[in-house]
Regions:
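Short beta-strand-centered segments that line the small-molecule binding cleft or hinge
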Residues: 1-35, 98-101, 121-123
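Short beta-strand-to-loop elements that line the ligand-binding cleft
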Residues: 13-14, 60, 80-89
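Short beta-strand->loop
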Residues: 22-32, 85, 108-111, 117-131
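Residues embedded in well-ordered beta-strands
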Residues: 32-34, 40, 56, 103, ...
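A late-sequence structural motif
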Residues: 121-164
Length: 164
């Protein structure tokens, strides 16, 4: 939508540069492990996919970027993750974790409010490759933004930074 000019800005996860797109803001957006408070791994500073494999998992479907990142890392390690739930709906996997069904994955921005409330624990996944994704605010290269849109971009830059 940004490249075609139908949108002034785009907010997306990215793993590569895009032609004709300027990045107004970028921050790392690693895949995080989601755990219920009180889980045996919840007090760790980080977890590995091998540790996560010991528990029931809710994972996104194979066609998603997050799942592809997980599958690449698992392939390198010869690790097989068996999901008991496959869903691309954040609310579904968060409920699964909160109700003690097991562990899942998400970006920090998707669960920031739940972590702040203490409703869920999010930890970095320390396996190499799980941090190779950015959250970007994108604009069309060479396009001047209207004042109101630029003000919104500035607000995003202020509000987006998180813990990771």
């Amino acid at each position: 939508a940004v490249r075609s000019g139908t949108a002034d800005i785009g907010l997306c996860f990215s793993r590569a540069p895009h032609k004709d797109i300027d990045v107004a803001y970028r921050q790392s957006a690693p895949v995080l492990a989601l755990l219920p408070p009180g889980h045996p791994l919840a007090s760790a500073g980080s977890v590995t996919l091998t540790q996560m494999a010991e528990y029931p998992l809710a994972l996104p479907p194979p066609e998603t970027t997050v799942r592809q990142m997980i599958d690449i890392v698992c392939s390198r390690q010869g690790l097989q993750l068996d999901a008991v739930l496959i869903s691309n709906h954040a609310k579904t996997v968060v409920n699964f974790v909160q109700l003690g069904g097991g562990l899942s994955v998400a970006s920090e921005i998707a669960v920031r409010h739940l972590v702040a409330e203490g409703a869920i624990v999010a930890l970095p996944i320390s396996d190499a490759g799980m941090d190779l994704r950015d959250l970007e605010v994108q604009t069309l290269a060479g396009r001047s933004l209207p004042v109101a849109v630029q003000a919104f971009v500035d607000l995003l830059k202020e509000q987006l930074p998180g813990r990771w």
